[in-house]
Amino acid sequence: IKFSKNNKNSKFRIVYCPPNTLIRPLSKRLKKTNLEVGAQNCHESENYGAYTGHVNSKMLKNVGAKYVILGHSENRQSGETDKLINLKIKSAIKSNLKVIFCIGETLSEKRKKRTNKVLAQQITSGLKSIKNTSNIIIAYEPVWSIGTGLIPKPNDLSNSISFIKSKFRKKTPKVLYGGSVNNKNITEIKDINVIDGFLIGGASQSSKKFIDIIKKTFN
C-alpha cells in the first residue's frame, strides 16, 4: 500500500485477489490508492438460494470486489467444466464485475501439440453467447507452468498469446500471462510485446518480491 501511494506511474494497474473474508476490509483500506480488489472465484447462480457455503457474484460485488478470477486451472482440476465457467462469467458480468478468465493447456496437451486447439476450445466454450467482452481479461496460464518454475520459451509464449488475440474479431481483450512469474524471470518475459500484464501467484505473497516485479516491469 505504501509503495502504491508513493508510486506516480499511471501505466500499471494492480488487482489483489485475496480470500473472500478479506475482500471487504481490503476494499475499504485501499479506497484512496490505485490498488483494486477482486475475488478468486464465484458461484454461478445469479440469485440467492440453497447453495450452502458458496458465494455468488452479487455478494462479491456487495463487499467491494471489482474483479473475479474464473477458470483457474486449480478449479478446472477439481472438476470445473467449460460450461460451468461460462455460467460463472455470465453471472459475474451481470453483477458488473470484471472477469479475469484463465485458460491454458496441460503438459500432455502441449506435448501432443494441441495447445492452440485447447485454447480455442476453452475460449469458445467459456465465452459462449457472450457478445460484449469489454469486461473480460484473458489470463493465459499453462497448467504445466504453474508452481513449477518452468515458463514457455519467449517465442512459444508470444505465439500462444497472439493466437488467443486472433480469436477475437472485434474488440481484442487484454491478455495476461500467468505461470511461475517471479522477480527473477520477469525481465525475460516483460519485453514480449503481445503480453498486456501478468497474473502473479506465489510471488505476490512476498511484498518485497511483488514490488520488485512491478519495478522491473516498468524499467
Language-model segments: what does each one mean?
Residues 1-219:
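Active-site loop-to-helix "anion-binding N-cap" substructures in soluble metabolic enzymes
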